[in-house]
Amino acid sequence: MRMDYSLLQPHTVELYKLKEHNFSLKRVNARTLLVVQRFDLFAKLFYIDNINTNPSEAERVYADHIKAFNPDGREPGRDDKNGVDDFITSFDEIIKHFKDHDFDERISVVPVDRNGVILDGAHRVAALAYFNREVTIVQFNDVDAVCNFDYNYFKNRGLSWSICDTIALEMVKWVDGVYAACIWPSNNQNNQQIAVSELNEQYQVAYIKDIRCNLNSLSSFVGYIYRAQDWTRNSLSVRDKASRVYGKSNLRVAFFKAESNLDDVLKEKDEIRHLLGKGKDSLHITDNRPETLDIANAVLTASGMNQWLDSRNLNFCHKLYSTLNERWFVFKNVQWIALKVAVYRIVNRLFKKHVVL
């Protein structure tokens, strides 16, 4: 089988040395390429889904995720994208085209790595997935993506946490097999991290949300997520459960993608509970997609959080805590590193100048 490499972006071919690797061509539904390792796909899907009903929010989410990806507004290997407006114009054309047309493999194909993670073509894949169309992929079976463009990548690039929440909710809507683990505040931070590590060892942790809440708020949250169970009809039972899972730590909600069936997830839940030593008061994991969507809406949207966060004072405290925490994170992981790089370049330039003189 011969491959026409002109169907791929030259930059991608060169970056991965694709001409040196074995490949196979396949026709697949684009939705099979929606994986949590490509968090950006869900920002693009959010844009498509909201551009006509809430254009300002759609453009804000899309533009900010592009800036996190490409701070200079340029796409490597492309001369036609010299700013966010060019990205939007190009994407609008792609959306318009695939709304009415199938993917034409005579024009292009989408490269993917051995695990089915796309190496290029995110805009095409997002549009095709939205309209439930097929795409021709060329899979390189001994190539791995050079970077994991998951939620951590975008947080570490300074994308605001509120926009990350919006994208994460979109991800939960589109990807099957996503569960939510509520790791209760009764666990100290070390044990909470142990729980996340255990989940990540077996599955792929797709997003983490930490929420600072008091006992009243946690009681409301407990009553909400367990509301289908009879015991929640008694407010004292709800309060008792909340008291047992309350502690000094944040409520940590970890969304993870599981390829295995529910029985395996339940087994993993029991193992983590045993490891943390608090039984059912260690963590809660959803059993199905509706439950996961329910929790996602409760913790990833402002309207959802306002339903259970203590309205008397916690909203302000939570916002202040979240703002300070986010700004410190951005300074430590983005601005401080950028400053060190800038200083290094200046010192290096001065050193070279001194050597020449």
PLM ranges: what are they?
Residues 113-131:
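A sequence-level detector for short glycine-anchored, His/Arg-bearing signature motifs
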Residues 162-347:
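Non-catalytic terminal and connector segments of soluble metabolic enzymes
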Residues 117-120, 146, 291-294:
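Short, well-ordered, mixed-charge alpha-helical segments that flank or form enzyme active sites
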Residues 354-357:
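Catalytic metal-binding acidic patch
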